[in-house]
Amino acid sequence: MSVIDDAPGGASDGAFEAASSGASGDVFDDALAKDRAIPDLDWHVFPEGTERDVLEAPSGALARVRLGPIDGPRVILVPGVTGSKEDFVLMFPLLAAAGYRVESLDLAGQYESWQAGPGNLDPPRPRYDYRLFADDMIAALVDGAAPAHVLGYSFAGLVAQQVLVERPELFASLTLLSTPPASGQVFRGVKRIGRFSAGASPRTGAALLLWGIRNNLNRVPPRRIAFVRERFALTRRDSVNDIVGLMMTTPDVTAEVHAQPIPKLVAVGMHDLWPTEEYAAYALAIGAELRVYPTGHSPCETTPHQLTRDMLAMFAAAP
């Protein structure tokens, strides 16, 4: 979740046409209408038939949900910092109805995986690092049929790209959802305030992120912000600090990701933190298609039908 307006229908039809022309097909399809009709819902509730369990990952027990035919192709949706598996609750029935086995899990230190972390590693380490999140993602991928279609949301997309380079045989496709289109100190490209981020510490950056979310600068509906604030009671602050620090030191794997022959998709809202032009350049650099939606940082919440439509089209093109 960002501090950019994520309200459904927040962009004009003309703006949507400009953002989607040549990218998402027919602008006025039923996916757009369905996204505009999303109600203020209870984000705790997954579709009937959803299975809950835990994945025993290197960092500890990760809370997981799964839905869809057991023998269906796997789709793994990985949330970002301060997020959780519930961010994909609207995508679950759409992917399952299309015949896919859809899964999501909370990152170590986040929401219902709050007890997982570097202290559980062998040997223990002092901080949440990229290796921890990469090994946890690999554990999720190998716990079932491979290769799988992987979506990494924001920070998780940075991790997913590193895992793709390391273990390409585990990926059928890669979707980068609102993933920073940069390496190194990724916040430098954020609209308006990026130039002020150079001297910020991870703790300061995390504090600003949490302040924006808690104060609902996104203007999300009441039940959504209530759920977001509720999960902060479990999410470990040190995990947020460390992840923000990791986003300030992101490895550059652009060329290596480009070299992978799987289908790749960069999916982003036109009001995201980073400029659309930077996303377009990054998509070109890694050999990905670009899709832009009339929303902010959270298309999985606000334009899930359009996002799922475009992912399914990409899956159909996978070998």
Regions picked out by a protein language model, each given a short descriptive name:
Residues 61-119:
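Conserved HGGG/HGGXW glycine-rich cap/lid loop of the alpha/beta-hydrolase fold
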Residues 1-54, 65-67:
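An N-terminal hydrophobic leader/cap segment in hydrolases
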Residues 264-301:
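Conserved loop-alpha-helix segment in the C-terminal half of the alpha/beta-hydrolase fold
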Residues 185-187, 203-258:
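Conserved alpha/beta-hydrolase catalytic His-Asp/Glu region
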Residues 46, 97, 103-151:
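Active-site loop/oxyanion-hole signature of alpha/beta-hydrolase fold enzymes
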Residues 301-315:
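Post-His helix in hydrolase/transferase enzymes
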Residues 152-156, 160:
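Gly/Ala-rich beta-loop-alpha elbow adjacent to hydrolase catalytic centers
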